[in-house]
């Protein structure tokens, strides 16, 4: 693994975009949560909401991107410095997910404010923007994003069905089986990690009496519902 690759093997993100509105002292705070995996996508989401709510006073934003949450940005969009974007970013960063950790990422939060005529003060703004994002997160559907190592296993046609059944019964994700003229290739995915792959290779050798080997096919990030084993 190079220094530019992610150290994380799993994180949590949105299963679907979500929005929620709060009214605080006659100001409307509409919080949008959008799944984004690049800065360009995050800025495009913000631009779209600016256009949609062109008559609003403020369009404050915060986003966290990448499996390691290595990209974090926030913007107050005209609110007093530090009263909007930073509290929104902190609400994303500190949110504990169903994984039991604060590992939310690939998410952009935009809070659109329609000013109601009552000044909230710096403390009131911090609370309002933080609450807007936190309340929206309460109603958002989340999903676990798991890094999977892909492998191809070559087997005789006669053994392929049995091997597939035994792998599935042991909890291995079998993506499919391709039958060629002389052999079958099982495509499998394993949670990526230093201990899992060697253990699988040992299990495969036992199942096939050493006749099959797993050829690496790269890695892929996969959405997985909570409660479903990878």
List PLM regions with ranges:
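Short amphipathic alpha-helix segments
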Residues: 154-174, 199
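Non-DNA-binding regulatory cores of transcription-related proteins
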Residues: 2, 174-190, 197-199, 210
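Glycine- and acidic-rich phosphate- and metal-coordinating loops
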Residues: 64, 104-115
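C-terminal regulatory domains involved in ligand/effector binding and gene-expression control
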Residues: 1-83, 195-230
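Conserved mixed alpha/beta catalytic, RNA-binding, or beta-rich assembly cores of soluble enzyme
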Residues: 81-98, 103, 115, 119, ...
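Long, charge-dense
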Residues: 122, 126-149
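Helix N-cap motif at beta-to-alpha junctions
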Residues: 38-39, 156-160, 189-197
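Short glycine-/aliphatic-rich beta-strand segments at the starts of folded cytosolic domains
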Residues: 142-159, 186
């Amino acid at each position: 693994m190079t220094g530019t690759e992610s150290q994380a093997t799993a994180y949590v993100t949105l299963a679907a975009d979500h929005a929620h509105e709060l009214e605080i002292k006659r100001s409307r705070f509409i919080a949008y949560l959008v799944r984004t995996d690049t800065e360009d996508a995050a800025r495009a989401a913000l631009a779209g909401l600016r256009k949609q709510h062109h008559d609003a006073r403020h369009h404050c934003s915060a986003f966290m991107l990448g499996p390691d949450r290595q990209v974090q940005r926030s913007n107050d969009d005209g609110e007093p410095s530090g009263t909007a974007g930073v509290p929104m970013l902190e609400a994303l960063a500190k949110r504990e997910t169903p994984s039991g950790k604060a590992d939310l990422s690939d998410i952009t939060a935009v809070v659109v404010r329609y000013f109601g005529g009552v000044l909230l003060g710096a403390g009131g703004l911090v609370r309002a923007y933080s609450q807007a994002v936190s309340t929206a997160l309460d109603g958002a559907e989340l999903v676990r994003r798991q890094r999977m190592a892909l492998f191809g296993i070559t087997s005789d046609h006669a053994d392929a069905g049995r091997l597939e059944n035994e792998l599935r019964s042991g909890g291995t994700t079998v993506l499919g089986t391709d039958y060629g003229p002389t052999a079958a290739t099982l495509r499998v995915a394993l949670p990526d990690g230093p201990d899992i792959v060697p253990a699988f290779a040992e299990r495969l050798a036992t199942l096939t009496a050493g006749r099959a080997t797993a050829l690496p096919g790269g890695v892929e990030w996969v959405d997985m519902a909570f409660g479903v084993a990878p």
